Every structure is written in structure tokens, then in C-alpha cells.
Amino acid sequence: MEFFTYMATKYKGVSNVIYEIWNEPSYKDHINQIDYTWAEIKEYSETVIAAIRAIEKDAVIIVGTPRWSQNVDDAANDPILGYDNLMYTLHFYAGTHKEWLRQKGDYAISKGLALFVTECGGMNADGQGPIDVESTEAWIEWMDENDISYAFWSISDKEETCSMLLPSAPSEGPWADTDLRP
């Protein structure tokens, strides 16, 4: 809790600070690929939320969900109660994640959860493959229809489809159009 207490104290009252308290809570056991359960994530999240709320009463706090922040339906069935300005994150990659994941989002919304897509991309979940334009457009339309904010991954210069910059781009900018991936 030391980190979140420090950050909440440092940024208290700064209206554009958003706390995402656990990015992609997945695989507590990487060898056997055993995911954290929603109950485990919820217990941790409630502790962190209480620490932040003790200092910062109104900031938006975003809670991750199992399976790389895809199982928002788990949170919808047992949401965190007693706090305002909570959101749950949903991550997708358009080449891999299709209508079935939007249906999980629809279910969470129908149960009253606020969603924020804090990571997404137009390619496959591994960051590679071609941009799936049709699926990306379907996701953007769905997010717009549901007033969901989103952030595409990633502003980096790695040699992968999801990187917006070419490996030759200066790491600290400024960037020209010739530094951007086509």
C-alpha cells in the first residue's frame, strides 16, 4: 500500500490522475497458467481502494479483472461496493478478441459497471499480425456507443505491429511522420 499511499498523497486534488491499481491480473502461477480469481483480485482491490480513498475521495480508480482484464463479467456478478468513481478495465486486441468479448462488456454494463478500455490494439493479442480493420472498427463503434474511453497500445519502437513508432525513431521525440509506422 506504500506506493498507492505515496501516489494519492502526491497527486491529491489533481483532477486528471486516474489510478489503475492492477494491470492485467493474470497467472499467479505462470508455469501452470493458473489465473488469479475475481475473489482474490477483489480482496486486493478493496484494500488498495481503501488506502487511496483515505487520502483522495474523488479520483477515478480502475480495477482489473481476471484473464488479462477480460473477465469483466466476473466483476459484474460480484462488484466492489461502497465507493464512487470506480471503473473496471477491459482489454482487447481486435485480431484475437471478437464479439464474445464485447458480450462480456455488454453484460457488465447491463449490471451497472463502468468500463474503461485501458489497453487495446488492432492486431493479435501477441502484438503481431496484420491490423484487423473490420474488427477494430467494430470495437471502436461499440466503445463509442457505450461512452467507453480507450487507449491503444503502444507508443514504442519495438519491432512489432502494435508499436506506433519505427525502430529508427528517436526515443525521446519529437517524431516526424517518417518515424511513424505506416
Residue ranges of predicted features:
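Extracellular glycoside hydrolase catalytic/binding regions
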Residues: E2-I18, W22-S149, W153-D157, C162-P182
